[in-house]
């Protein structure tokens, strides 16, 4: 089982070729443990299945609400945007606090990242930065050396797979991302180093 952070496209692709059963877990500090699993082998849909005696719903924001009586007597309200399939199944879309509002259009960075993931080998993320006209503009932040003109052009061709407002307006290269003690990318810390 894998958990602690969403499983990357590259890792999921590598796992799909191995003769083992692999699962991504969903959990958070408030739930103490994982409350749902998603098969990483043979399943094309990215659907989490809750564990026994756990049900889920979505609040008015579209965020996951967890009902797990053995863990908490109160529902646990998250900031995770989901597509609810049933009271026992959901698709994780991203974090509501990461949503980019660009020209009045709400963009989920994690959705854009999943589309671009098979075109990039280095670590990257999608972010919103202040823009006088749009409020926020979408940017692609890449770890490593600055891209060559040819690499940039190739990458921009892949942007065509995205919806118009999801397409990054700029590509920012940073030699090393800021990280948490556990190795997760600190998006805000990384962006702050650019300013």
Go through the PLM ranges and name each one.
Residues 23-30, 48, 127-130:
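Beta-strand->loop->alpha-helix junctions that form or flank phosphate-binding loops
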Residues 55-77, 81-83, 89:
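AMP-binding/adenylate-forming core of the ANL superfamily
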Residues 65, 91-93, 180, 186:
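Generic structural signal for well-ordered beta-strand positions
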Residues 76-166:
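AMP-binding/adenylate-forming catalytic core of the ANL superfamily
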Residues 185-195:
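Phosphopantetheine-dependent thiolation modules in NRPS/PKS and related acyl-activating systems
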């Amino acid at each position: 089982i894998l958990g602690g952070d969403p499983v990357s496209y590259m890792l999921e692709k590598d796992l799909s070729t191995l003769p083992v059963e692999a699962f991504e877990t969903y959990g958070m500090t408030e739930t103490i443990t994982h409350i749902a699993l998603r098969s990483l082998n043979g399943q094309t849909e990215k659907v989490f299945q809750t564990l026994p005696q756990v049900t889920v719903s979505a609040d008015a924001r579209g965020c996951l609400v967890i009902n797990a009586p053995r863990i908490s007597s109160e529902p646990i309200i998250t900031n995770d945007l989901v597509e609810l399939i049933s009271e026992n199944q959901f698709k994780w879309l991203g974090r509501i606090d990461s949503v980019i509002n660009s020209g009045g259009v709400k963009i989920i960075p994690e959705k854009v990242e999943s589309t671009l993931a098979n075109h990039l080998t280095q670590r990257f993320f999608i972010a919103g930065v202040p823009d006088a006209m749009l409020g926020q503009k979408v940017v692609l932040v890449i770890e490593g050396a600055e891209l060559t003109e040819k690499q940039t052009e190739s990458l921009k061709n892949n942007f065509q797979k995205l919806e118009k407002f999801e397409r990054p307006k700029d590509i920012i290269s940073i030699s090393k991302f800021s990280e948490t003690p556990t190795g997760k990318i600190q998006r805000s810390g990384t962006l702050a180093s650019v300013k």
